[in-house]
């Protein structure tokens, strides 16, 4: 039986737990994406540094476009499929896309491992775009559900905290498993990754997807989305934001004029660039 919100603004503990694991699949795959994508395509698939970087760039561009599209469309969606919640419907679409595409991103090209590199490039780019679309679906809708689950600031902070705790745990898990797998299978020189180590990435990928999928099942079974009409939910959200007089609803144009937006974006971008550059010699 799905746990429900015990009071309009208080989320039950089982519901908090179910919500907190709803982004684990994204966290696990994102950790592997940013940490090992360049390593895999350069050392395992034997792409050039430039080609590996282009695949990463394609993924990030697809992510940016998909995030914008899904952000607007998920808000405009009024009902979910077959009576399912509108946010959880988009989230489920994302899970299906991620689970169906991510394993192909970190495995050798099926029946085309000996094909020309340009053909393999197209093969991987196709699955990367699908993966990034699915990742954006799950990320946007999962975060959006916080405002619909509760209007109490303390409860929202708690949900965000639990969500972030699982993000940290997911990153640690990926690094720990990768360290164990590389240490066991890489031979004497554990820093030398070659195409012969493709099975390591295959094992890591299926481990990540398997655990992430289990958490997604917990999320979809364990959390009940609000049954209020979309218009009423949005109205209640606006009232909660403006009730104190401290917060005002911002348009996207005003949001782009906020300096904090660019500060956070630059810090995040340069941090990722430094991390990615250190992965491949």
Positions of PLM-derived features:
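Intracellular loop-helix junctions on the cytosolic face of multi-pass helical membrane proteins
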Residues: 1-15, 110-125, 129, 137-281
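Helix-loop boundary and gating motifs at the non-cytosolic
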Residues: 2-62, 262-281
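Conserved glycine-rich helix-kink/hinge and helix-boundary motifs of the Major Facilitator Superfamily
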Residues: 20, 53, 57, 88, ...
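Residue-level signal for conserved functional micro-sites within the alpha-helical transmembrane segments
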Residues: 30, 60-63, 67, 135, ...
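Helix-to-coil boundary motifs at intracellular loop junctions of multi-pass secondary transporters
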Residues: 40-45, 76-77, 145-152
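Central cavity-lining transmembrane alpha-helices of secondary-active solute carriers
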Residues: 52-78, 94-101, 168-177
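C-terminal ends and interior cores of transmembrane alpha-helices
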Residues: 80, 89-117
């Amino acid at each position: 039986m799905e746990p429900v919100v015990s009071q309009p603004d208080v989320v039950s503990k089982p519901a908090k737990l179910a919500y907190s694991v709803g982004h684990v699949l994204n966290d696990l795959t994102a950790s592997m994406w940013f940490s090992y994508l360049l390593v895999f395509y350069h050392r395992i698939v034997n792409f050039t540094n430039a080609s590996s970087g282009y695949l990463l760039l394609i993924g990030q561009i697809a992510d940016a476009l998909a995030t914008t599209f899904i952000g607007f469309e998920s808000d405009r969606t009024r009902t979910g499929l077959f009576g399912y919640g509108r946010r959880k419907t988009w989230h489920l679409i994302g899970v299906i896309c991620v689970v169906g595409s991510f394993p192909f991103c970190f495995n050798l090209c099926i029946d085309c491992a000996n094909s020309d590199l340009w053909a393999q490039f197209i093969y991987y780019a196709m699955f990367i775009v699908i993966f990034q679309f699915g990742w954006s679906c799950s990320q946007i809708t999962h975060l959006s559900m916080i405002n619909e689950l509760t209007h109490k600031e303390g409860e929202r902070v708690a949900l965000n905290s639990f969500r972030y705790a699982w993000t940290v745990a997911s990153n640690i898990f990926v690094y720990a498993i990768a360290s164990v797998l590389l240490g066991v299978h890489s031979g004497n020189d554990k820093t030398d990754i070659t195409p012969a180590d493709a099975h390591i990435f295959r094992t890591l990928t299926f481990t990540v997807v398997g655990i992430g999928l289990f958490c997604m099942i917990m999320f979809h079974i364990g959390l009940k989305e609000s049954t209020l009409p979309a218009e009423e939910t949005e109205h209640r959200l606006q009232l909660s934001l403006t009730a104190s007089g401290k917060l005002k609803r911002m348009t996207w144009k005003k949001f782009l004029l906020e300096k904090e937006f660019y500060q956070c974006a630059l810090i995040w971008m340069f941090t990722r660039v430094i991390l990615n550059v250190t992965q491949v010699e």
